């Protein structure tokens, strides 16, 4: 998958988890940009992303993600 394909799929996951069809992701999107994205929803989001992409993040990866761009970078590395 290329970056654009991952972003499209990830956008669908975010829209589903946060029940908001208006969400548009960019590399710089953070939890501050999405009202419903709190610490509890973060757990749901990570689980949904792992399920959608059929992979598991390490704790180091999860704690190190500062924005959507970093999440996409990890997903791209795993897709290789």
Regions found by a protein language model. Name each.
Residues 2-37, 41-47, 51-80:
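Phosphopantetheine-dependent thiolation modules in NRPS/PKS and related acyl-activating systems
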């Amino acid at each position: 998958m290329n970056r654009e394909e991952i972003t499209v799929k990830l956008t669908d996951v975010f829209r589903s988890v946060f029940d908001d069809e208006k969400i548009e992701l960019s590399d710089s999107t953070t939890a501050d940009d999405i009202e419903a994205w709190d610490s509890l929803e973060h757990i749901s989001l990570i689980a949904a992303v792992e399920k959608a992409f059929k992979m598991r993040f390490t704790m180091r990866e999860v704690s190190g993600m500062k924005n959507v761009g970093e999440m996409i970078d990890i997903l791209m590395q795993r897709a290789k």
